[in-house]
Amino acid sequence: AVWKDFLKNIGKAAGKAVLNSVTDMVNE
């Protein structure tokens, strides 16, 4: 289904954003 792919892409993007935020906090 199209909406499933849509949600999957949002999930991936959100996951990357969270991961980047955590990495930035750890590096500082």
Curated annotation (Swiss-Prot):
InterPro entries: Dermaseptin_dom. Expressed by the skin glands. It is found in: Secreted. One of its GO terms (biological process) is innate immune response. It comes from the Eukaryota. One of its GO terms (cellular component) is extracellular region. Its main location: secreted. Keywords: Amphibian defense peptide, Antimicrobial, Immunity, Innate immunity, Secreted. Belongs to the frog skin active peptide (FSAP) family. Dermaseptin subfamily. Probable antimicrobial peptide which stimulates insulin-release in glucose-responsive BRIN-BD 11 cells. This is Dermaseptin-SP1. It comes from Agalychnis spurrelli. The lineage of its organism: Eukaryota, Metazoa, Chordata, Craniata, Vertebrata.
